[in-house]
């Protein structure tokens, strides 16, 4: 190699040293000084791994003094390069800069600079980079982004709600599905969409204390969202790191009690600038016009400050009208400010519901009915649609569907309230009751008599509660020596049932924690039955361990013994056998108990076993629940109302179960009331709301589309290619499971999302749902998203050299494959990628500027190429640098047309979509007050910013491949 003192060279193997200067040489060696690090390197002159740094006209270079020069001309004087051009800071022209005075800290980031500097990547990395660009761009444009990556069943009504709400600006909605329909999943899907799109970055979830850890685990396991759990200890600890402890984390879970207990803490929560607030079990927030509870006021303060709010609550029927109004008031106090007015509005929606029922029935409509529809929708140009809906034409059903959609848009609370019922959602199992009447032991009879004498002054309610749990009465008298489990026939029955069903998982629920603990000891000591215990005295982590042990198939516990808290929030639908060792005091708690197994996704009919003692309050209550309310075998939305009306009579029968006169009449009366209320509820069902929440055929198609995307073979091929190149070990374990572990030669020391001890992955949704230890890999999984970022944010694969063996072309023919990226820069929350994601434009240019990309597909072409080692590649590039530079100039002139077309299409699409959305909502605003002014303002502002950002969109060269034709 011809070396001269003062020349600038770069190391092919240690590019981080920056620019080197020739400072010494002899016949065999040359010494380079790298001023940016102060290090010297001695190389053999004949075959040194260094590349001469030479810039070309059009490049911009930096002097050692920091000013920049745009090169117009390159001269050579005595073997040294002199650059002539315009100085950018002073705009002085004809300025010279000798290569020896170049900035030594020069980093080559442009693909062409890296190529000419000898920083040549492996060919497979170039291919991976192009695929990453292509797939990332496609994924940004795929419908249902944010709904495909969660580890959940594809249940249409859940997807429908999440798809509707997740795309909104700062959604403020009430999720009020019946128990077992998956409100937590819906909330998680909405969060996942908002976070993935950039619409939200900071999220606060407030839940009852008993559900904190469950939410933490669900968000991580199902949605790959890592929340931080804040309690007193974590809050105090975080105060050392920031004035506002909640600003130390982006995603936070805390309990309602934690939030409202301390005034300063609540202020910190309010000041933490959350984008989304989620409140679970919101029906526990007590409100009345005169005396709202502290919990309600705490959430109200937060809801006033946080743009997006999701409230998860019981159904409106269970809540009652006033409580339901209180929830809506949290979402939009301006819209829901007058309770009486709200009640009146609800009555006025009946004609709309009737109209929907009319359309859904599919019968021909009378002129009066057509006129009524026209009045309700209130648009001048609706006549053709009405005629089509009432005709025998092929488009009649489509017209009816559109009319239903228009009615839903214009009336009711359907934009702020989502409520699915079991009637409208298929797929629930049957519930079968098995009662077991057992004799009352003499020990209990004696204890009950004594208790009656000693507790004569107790209220009927207290006596009733005592009578439900005779083992507690007995234990109270006998103290520590009382071993009720030795004679209670329910214990013998339970042991017999469990031993005869060893292979089945059984959930046992009892009211008291002490009962659960005592039963565990008896089952373990007498029969060796593996039983986990779950009660309020355990820490959250201990409860999780107990639940996980119960969930294990082979080595797990056969039975989980829960106190009453076990029937709130925890789901065990992998089990189908429920034993109620005793009965809860009200029908809501009964439904909660059954609801732990009776959930969507339950594969078997639920067997409900109730062993009860005759002549006790248990025998009274089991009859009342079953015969009076039908509450065991069906959900009972009327339960609370009937319980309240029959309370006094029921309490008396429970307090004195031997007094049975009139009890049959009470049961008959309650059953009649139940049937009447049920019919009334059915008649008054908000069909409009149910149709909107359920999604119908549209939701079915949504689930089907996502299921089809699950079968994307491109993902598997890309992921394996990515893991290979990053350096992640892959061990195929069979059954569609692969174990990933870090290696010692990874591109980065710590790959984001890959634990130190590795992880198990699967590309199959069914496998992920059955194996909690396996992560479900989709395009939305952090491993894939982080992998894409790792490749595309750096220069991996941005320059390479290949040989093309093709005897149809002359030896030495040059081709340059260019990958440009057309993109726009904008804040993430604008979601610009919907319209113009970073989009690759591939060119394959020959020496004359002919673009062959359309004739030669990338993967086909890539398979015909062979690799060149870096040293040989550098020599090839240096030999034809001027030719390659000329081809690059031709590429720059050709890319503009393609890029402009992409940008113009994106602007047109963005303007049409956002203007259309704004116009639609503005039109609806006149007839539906549930559309918020701030939502309209946000869409308008978003539209203007998106269009402005697209006006400033540009393009850049992202990667290039230099190809030389050979015949060998």
Swiss-Prot record:
SUBUNIT field: Interacts with the RNAP. Has a higher affinity for the core RNAP than for the holoenzyme. Its ATPase activity is stimulated by binding to RNAP.
EC top class, as a word: hydrolase
Name of this protein: RNA polymerase-associated protein RapA
Listed Gene3D superfamilies: 2.30.30.140, 2.30.30.930, 3.30.360.80, 6.10.140.1500, 6.10.140.2230, P-loop containing nucleotide triphosphate hydrolases, Tandem AAA-ATPase domain
Binding site for ATP: 177-184
UniProt organism field: Salmonella paratyphi A (strain AKU_12601)
Gene it is expressed from: rapA
SUPFAM superfamilies, sorted: P-loop containing nucleoside triphosphate hydrolases
InterPro entries associated with the record: Helicase_ATP-bd, Helicase_C-like, Helicase_RapA, P-loop_NTPase, RapA_C, SNF2-like_sf, SNF2/RAD54-like_C, SNF2_N
Presence of keyword ATP-binding: yes
Family: Belongs to the SNF2/RAD54 helicase family. RapA subfamily.
Gene Ontology MF annotations: ATP binding; DNA binding; helicase activity; hydrolase activity, acting on acid anhydrides
Keyword ATP-binding: yes
Keywords per UniProt: Activator, ATP-binding, DNA-binding, Helicase, Hydrolase, Nucleotide-binding, Transcription, Transcription regulation
Pfam families named in the record: Helicase_C, RapA_C, SNF2-rel_dom, Tudor_1_RapA, Tudor_RapA
HAMAP family: Helicase_RapA
The protein's Enzyme Commission number: 3.6.4.-
């Amino acid at each position: 190699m011809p070396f001269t003192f003062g020349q600038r060279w770069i190391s092919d193997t240690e590019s981080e040293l920056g620019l080197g200067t020739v400072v010494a040489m002899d016949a065999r060696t040359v010494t380079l000084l790298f001023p940016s690090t102060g290090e010297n390197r001695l190389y053999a002159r004949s075959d040194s791994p260094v590349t001469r740094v030479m810039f070309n006209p059009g490049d911009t270079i930096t002097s050692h003094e920091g000013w920049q020069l745009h090169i117009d001309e390159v001269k050579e004087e005595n073997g040294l390069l002199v650059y002539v051009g315009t100085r950018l800071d002073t705009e002085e022209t004809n300025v010279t800069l000798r290569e020896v005075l170049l900035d030594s800290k020069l980093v080559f980031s442009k693909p062409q600079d890296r190529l000419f500097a000898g920083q040549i990547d492996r060919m497979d990395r170039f291919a991976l980079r192009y695929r990453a660009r292509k797939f990332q761009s496609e994924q940004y444009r795929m419908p249902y982004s944010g709904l495909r990556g969660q580890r959940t069943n594809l249940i249409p009504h859940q997807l429908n709600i999440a798809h509707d709400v997740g795309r909104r600006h700062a959604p403020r909605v009430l999720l009020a599905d019946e128990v077992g329909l998956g409100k937590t999943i819906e909330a998680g899907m909405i969060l996942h969409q908002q976070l993935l799109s950039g619409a939200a970055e900071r999220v606060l979830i407030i839940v009852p204390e008993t559900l904190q850890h469950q939410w933490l685990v669900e968000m991580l396991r199902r949605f790959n969202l890592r929340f931080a759990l804040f309690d007193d200890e974590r809050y105090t600890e975080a105060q050392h790191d920031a004035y506002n402890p909640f600003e130390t984390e982006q995603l936070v879970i805390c309990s309602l009690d934690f939030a409202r207990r301390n005034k300063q803490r609540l202020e910190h929560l309010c000041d933490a600038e959350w984008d989304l607030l989620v409140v679970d079990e919101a029906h526990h927030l007590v409100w009345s016009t005169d005396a709202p509870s502290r919990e309600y006021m705490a959430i109200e303060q937060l809801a006033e400050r946080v743009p997006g709010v999701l409230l998860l609550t019981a159904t409106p029927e269970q809540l009652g009208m006033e409580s339901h109004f209180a929830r809506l008031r949290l979402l939009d106090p301006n819209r829901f400010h007058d309770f009486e007015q709200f009640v009146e509005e609800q009555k006025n929606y009946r004609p709309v519901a009737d109209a929907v029922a009319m359309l859904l029935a599919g019968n021909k409509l009378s002129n009066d009915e057509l006129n009524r529809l026209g009045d309700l929708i209130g648009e001048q140009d609706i006549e053709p649609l009405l005629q089509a809906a009432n005709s025998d034409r092929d488009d009649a059903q489509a017209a009816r569907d559109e009319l239903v959609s228009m009615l839903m848009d214009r009336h009711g609370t359907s934009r702020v309230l989502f409520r699915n019922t079991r009637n409208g959602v298929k797929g629930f199992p049957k519930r079968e009751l098995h009662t077991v009447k057992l004799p009352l032991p003499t020990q209990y009879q004696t204890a009950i008599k004594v208790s009656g004498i000693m507790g004569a002054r107790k209220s009927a309610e207290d006596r009733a509660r005592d009578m439900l749990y005779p083992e507690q009465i007995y234990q109270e008298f006998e103290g520590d020596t009382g071993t009720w489990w030795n004679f209670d026939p329910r214990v013998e029955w339970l042991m017999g049932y469990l031993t005869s069903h060893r292979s089945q998982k059984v959930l046992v629920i009892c009211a008291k924690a002490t009962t659960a603990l005592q039963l565990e000891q008896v089952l373990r000591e007498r029969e060796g039955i593996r039983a986990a215990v779950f009660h309020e005295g355990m820490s959250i982590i201990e409860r999780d361990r107990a639940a996980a042990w119960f969930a294990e198939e082979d080595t797990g516990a056969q039975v989980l013994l829960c106190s009453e808290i076990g029937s709130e929030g925890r789901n065990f639908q992998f089990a189908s056998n429920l034993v109620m060792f005793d009965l809860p005091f009200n029908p809501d708690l009964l439904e909660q108990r059954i609801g732990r197994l009776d959930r969507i996704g339950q594969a078997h009919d639920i067997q409900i076993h109730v062993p009860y003692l005759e002549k006790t309050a248990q025998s009274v209550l089991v009859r009342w629940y079953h015969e009076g309310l039908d509450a065991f075998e069906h959900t009972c939305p009327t339960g609370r109302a009937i319980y309240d009306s029959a309370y006094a009579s029921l309490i008396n029968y429970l307090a004195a179960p031997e007094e049975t006169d009139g009890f049959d009449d009470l049961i008959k009366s309650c059953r009649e009331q139940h049937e009447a209320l049920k019919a009334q509820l059915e008649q008054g069902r908000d069909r409009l709301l149910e149709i909107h929440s359920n999604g119908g055929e549209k939701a079915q198609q949504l689930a089907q589309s996502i299921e089809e995307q699950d079968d994307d073979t491109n993902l598997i091929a890309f992921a394996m290619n990515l893991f290979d190149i990053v350096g992640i070990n892959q061990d195929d374990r069979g059954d569609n499971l692969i174990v990933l572990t870090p290696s010692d030669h990874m591109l980065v020391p710590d790959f984001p999302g890959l634990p130190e001890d590795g992880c198990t992955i699967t590309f199959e949704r069914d496998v992920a749902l059955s194996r909690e230890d396996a992560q479900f890999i989709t395009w939305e999984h952090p491993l894939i998203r982080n992998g894409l970022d790792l490749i595309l944010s750096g220069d991996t694969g941005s320059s390479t050299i290949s040989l093309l063996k093709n005897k149809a072309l002359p030896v030495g023919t040059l081709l340059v494959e260019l990958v440009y990226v057309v993109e726009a820069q904008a804040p993430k929350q604008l979601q610009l990628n919907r319209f113009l994601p970073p989009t690759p434009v591939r060119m394959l240019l020959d020496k004359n500027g002919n673009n062959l990309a359309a004739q030669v597909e990338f993967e086909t072409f890539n398979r015909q190429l062979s690799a060149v080692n870096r040293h040989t590649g550098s020599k090839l590039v240096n030999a034809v640098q001027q030719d390659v530079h000329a081809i690059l100039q031709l590429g720059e002139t050709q890319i503009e047309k393609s890029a402009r077309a992409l940008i113009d299409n994106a602007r047109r699409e963005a303007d049409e979509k956002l203007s259309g959305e704004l116009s639609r909502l503005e039109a609806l605003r006149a007839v539906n007050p549930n559309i918020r002014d701030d939502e309209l303002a946000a869409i308008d502002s978003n539209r203007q910013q998106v269009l402005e950002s697209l006006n400033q969109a540009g393009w850049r060269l992202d990667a290039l491949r230099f190809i030389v034709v050979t015949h060998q």
